[in-house]
A protein has these predicted regions:
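Sec-dependent N-terminal signal peptides of Gram-positive bacterial secreted proteins and lipoproteins
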Residues: 5-26
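Compositionally biased intrinsically disordered regions enriched in Thr/Gly
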Residues: 24-252, 260-263, 282, 376, ...
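Short, ordered beta-strand-loop transition motifs
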Residues: 36-39, 96-99, 179-182, 275-280, ...
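Glycine-centered tight beta-turn/hairpin loop motif at sheet-sheet or coil-to-beta transitions
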Residues: 38-40, 117, 286-292, 298, ...
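Short helix/turn-capping signatures at newly exposed starts of structured segments
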Residues: 71, 229-344, 380-388
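Long, charged/polar, surface-exposed segments that mediate recognition or autoinhibition
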Residues: 103-111, 117-158, 295-356, 361
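Short, exposed beta-strand-loop hairpins at the edges of beta-sheets
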Residues: 363-365, 369-378
Length: 388
């Protein structure tokens, strides 16, 4: 009995310590700073650093981890060697999430090891409560089952779709580097394993809803703290979240917004295929896991790319606050979003003109934009479109 009482006391103490850690983070102003070194127009090393933690030792530990995860010290040393000639640039994206997590990616491009230009994608997924690097197994209830499910999805769904657009196309084994994004698990591959035709390191994002059966969605788990629950489950709050995001001209997980320059986006992400025509103009497919089965809609390019902007975003894969392509039924979203502002039948002729299948489209007006939800003849969501 004494042993059991002691265990209970220790468990309570551990719970209190976790609560204290959470409170201390909430009460401090934690920020992410851009740090780096610019030696020339061709040599620029930039990386993130976390500041503002009450625990200075923890802050140092986290920043050391960020540099280690992303090879920053090696890049700084290499930059010094290239002063007399050569190119090396790093850039990062990410930051602190609401759940006290630091998530970032670093892209390094140039003469990283030899004079031959190449690219490396790396990432950091750090729990700010204790500074530990989040492991893949922390995301799942059964890691072995999750790995099997991921590999099956990569080989059966992704590989056939992308193989013609890749220089190196080994989607398995699962790479070590990954990013815990709000909308899915993004895998970052070594360039020798998976690379695009433009010789850039490949990445693949798998929507969390595709792995729903094995996700650890416990209350204080990593994915719950990341906000994955609200992204894959349709709930009463989904309508307001959709309105908030779409009112900004965006869809979750897509690094483009309505009004963005098509020229700048194609320069940054590169074309996967030549622009395809549709009833309203052209559809752009870009390289990278964040754009898989996602298309940017614009005009007919009569004035040239440099004058064209994004007029719409179309997702044929992914999830937006419970609207999961290939899974959510029309009756389900009607029960949460209510009746649409308008609706239309999509005939075979209309479907062919828009590169979609026959069915129905529901239109919801949110601010300056219109959310279009396409369902097939069986009532399953097949595409999400946000347009002007």
């Amino acid at each position: 009995m004494k042993c059991i009482r002691r265990i209970r006391q220790l468990s309570c103490l551990a719970a209190v310590l976790v609560m204290i850690a959470g409170c201390s983070l909430a009460e401090t102003e934690i920020r992410v700073e851009d740090r780096g070194l610019d030696l020339s127009d061709e040599i620029s090393i930039h990386y993130p650093a976390v500041t503002g933690l009450a625990d200075a030792e923890l802050e140092e530990q986290i920043n050391d981890r960020i540099q280690q995860d992303n090879g920053i010290r090696d890049y700084l040393a290499r930059a010094a060697q290239l002063i007399s000639g050569g190119s090396l640039k790093t850039e990062w994206a990410g930051g602190i999430t609401d759940g006290d997590l630091f998530i970032c990616t670093v892209s390094a491009e140039g003469a990283l090891e030899t004079t031959r230009s190449t690219q490396v994608l790396t990432a950091s997924n750090i729990d700010l409560r204790d500074g530990h690097e989040i492991r893949l197994d922390e995301l799942f209830t059964d890691e072995a089952a999750a790995r099997e499910m991921i590999e099956s999805y990569l080989e059966n769904e992704v590989a056939p779709e992308l193989s013609a657009h890749l220089q190196n196309s080994e989607v398995t084994p699962i790479p070590e580097a990954f990013v815990i994004e709000l909308t899915g698990l993004r895998l970052l591959y070594p360039v020798k394993q998976l690379s695009t035709l433009s010789d850039r390191a490949g990445d693949i994002r798998i929507g969390w809803y595709r792995l729903r059966e094995v996700l650890d969605l416990s209350e204080d788990g990593i994915l719950s703290r990341r906000g994955v629950n609200e992204m894959i489950d349709l709930m009463p709050e989904s309508a307001e979240k959709l309105k908030g995001t779409t009112a900004e001209g965006r869809l979750p997980g897509i690094p483009a917004a309505i009004g963005d320059s098509m020229q700048e986006l194609t320069d940054r992400y590169h074309l996967l295929t030549d622009p395809d025509g549709y009833e309203g103009g052209r559809m752009f497919a870009l390289e990278g896991g964040m754009f898989r089965k996602t298309y940017l809609l614009t005009d007919d390019l009569g004035a040239g790319w440099e004058n064209s902007t994004v007029q719409g975003i179309r997702m044929d894969e992914g999830c937006a606050y419970g609207l999961c392509v290939g899974e959510t039924l029309r009756d389900e979203w009607l029960s949460v979003l209510c009746e649409p502002d308008s609706e239309a039948e999509i005939s075979e002729e209309k479907a062919e003109a828009n590169r979609i299948v026959p069915g129905k489209c529901d239109y919801y007006n949110y601010g300056d934009y219109r959310l279009q939800l396409y369902s097939d003849e069986g009532g399953t969501l097949i595409s999400i479109v946000l347009a002007e």
